[in-house]
Amino acid sequence: MNTVRVTFLLVFVLAVSLGQADKDENRMEMQEKTEQGKSYLDFAENLLLQKLEELEAKLLEEDSEESRNSRQKRCIGEGVPCDENDPRCCFGLVCLKPTLHGIWYKSYYCYKK
């Protein structure tokens, strides 16, 4: 019975001592990994920041240029009355006083240039 107790005690002491060594090694590994992780996170953060700055530059460039798809808003078509002080005739039209057939209306109309 003593032999079993001694054997058990010996195994217990070995397990505890080896467990402590593993614990220290694990702690050191975790510190190394966190340091590597921090450097990786810094690298990833810088890369993401560069990409965001590039996207922002592209967006600002697109905003400054006139888009091909943009159109004039609320323009007045041909033959429609307009205000001589604030003409809103569509592109290619001019706000002019009518000739002959529209004289009695006393208003300006949008005509082709």
From Swiss-Prot:
Signal peptide: 1-21
Keyword terms of this UniProt record: Disulfide bond, Ion channel impairing toxin, Knottin, Potassium channel impairing toxin, Secreted, Signal, Toxin, Voltage-gated potassium channel impairing toxin, Voltage-gated sodium channel impairing toxin
Residues that make up the propeptide removed upon maturation: 22-74
InterPro entries: Toxin_22
Keyword Chloroplast: no
Molecular functions per Gene Ontology: potassium channel regulator activity; sodium channel inhibitor activity; toxin activity
Tissue expression per record: Expressed by the venom gland.
Cystines in this chain: 75-90, 82-95, 89-110
Family: Belongs to the neurotoxin 14 (magi-1) family. 01 (HNTX-16) subfamily.
Annotated domain remarks: The presence of a 'disulfide through disulfide knot' structurally defines this protein as a knottin.
UniProt name for this protein: U11-theraphotoxin-Hhn1v
Upper lineage: Eukaryota, Metazoa, Ecdysozoa, Arthropoda, Chelicerata
